Amino acid sequence: MKATVIGAGNSGLAMAAHLSRGGNSVTLWNRSGSTISRISSTHVIHCEGEIQGDIRIDTITDDIRLALKDPDIVLVTTPANSHRELAELIAKNIRKSTVIVLNPGRTLGALEFRRTYDRYNTEYPQTIAETQTIIYTCRKTTEDSVHIMAMKDSVLISALDARMNKDIIRYL
């Protein structure tokens, strides 16, 4: 699977490392290049806790077009107050239909994301889902390191179109 992780904070680093460790091709995007400068040069996230080791990430970028070049799934790991801006940015730059999961979306985040996305892009419809919370209890300890204290046994997830839920869960 080709996954794009949006956001290089606590949960973004954890998710990128976990997906890569699982054999997926991972692109990690962050709006600020300075936040990812060290990872950009090494392509490694250092993990401790539930996931341990130095985990290689295929692509690290602050170029949204590169990040959205051909993902099978887009995982947004930023705070909810950035979702509207990201929906617009993704809508203006993505060139395929895929699954976008807000981690977390919580309170109608997927609905706001959908409405914003659709204002800017109707050519590439997206399946948009949100989780109740992030699956990791984690802390970014340095620019390129994350401590994953725990991974939750389950997290609620739903697409705006609930008929898609089984497919999304199977995919994840």
PLM features: residue spans?
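Rossmann-like NAD(P)(H) cofactor-binding subdomain of soluble oxidoreductases
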Residues: 80-142
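Internal alpha-helical scaffold of NAD(P)-dependent oxidoreductase catalytic cores
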Residues: 142-172
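Short, charged/polar "capping" segments at the starts of alpha-helices
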Residues: 34-39, 108-111, 167
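A general structural motif
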Residues: 23, 71, 95-97, 125, ...
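Rossmann-like NAD(P)-binding element
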Residues: 51-101
